[in-house]
Amino acid sequence: SHAAEVTAGYYNLHDRDDYRPIARMLTRHHASLNFTCAEMRDSEQSSQAMSAPEELVQQVWSAGWREGLNIACENALPRYDPTAYNTILRNARPHGINHSSPTEHKLFGFTYLRLSNQLLEGQNYVNFKTFVDRMHANLPHDPSVDPVAPLQRSGPEIPIEVILQAAQPKLDPFPFEDHTDLPVQCLGGIGGGEVECPAGGIGGEVQQDPTGGMGGELPPAV
């Protein structure tokens, strides 16, 4: 259902993509598109709400990438569990890691919400540290990847007609893998080892856990 979007003025219908005109407008200002709900799965939402956060993320990411924007995001809810971390990792690199050339579609940045005492306790902190390593593809931080540079001046004004042309035709979003190729693992394997967490792909069934997060910027995903 797109009732909430239409009520808010977003005419994001079956034949119209109302996020891509926003992305096109942002290109004039050399801006990044920062979106939310990166940790959410469809199966965690109430069926009565007819909510599909995974498909929404796909659509918004794709709209931004098609317009040449850098995409950044954050988690909407405080989460500590590997299921949420693995959803974020899948959305950070929808096609996984490309070992032969730079990854075409990946996040430019990620804000993790939020710092709490619960995050720093026991397994929650272990999960978080592993998640940060996975966001870096298990590589050490390279400060030269995103050097600090002066902001660019905004470009010429884009006519509203040109902005609105981006809404139609509505293109299919770029495909996302069902799972991340670098998951955060759950404890519980044979002899106390690690096993992959229950996950499921887009629309898959998972068990939601009590959760939390941290306020701070992680460097761009590899």
Curated annotation (Swiss-Prot):
Source organism, top-level taxon: Eukaryota
Annotated binding of substrate, by residue: 36, 75-76, 114
Reaction equations catalysed: Hydrolysis of (1->4)-alpha-D-glucosidic linkages in polysaccharides so as to remove successive maltose units from the non-reducing ends of the chains
Assigned keywords, A-Z: Carbohydrate metabolism, Glycosidase, Hydrolase, Polysaccharide degradation
BP GO annotations: polysaccharide catabolic process
Keyword Hydrolase: yes
Pfam family, one: Glyco_hydro_14
Top-rank EC class of the record's enzyme: hydrolase
GO molecular function annotation: beta-amylase activity
Sequence similarity: Belongs to the glycosyl hydrolase 14 family.
Name of this chain's protein: Beta-amylase
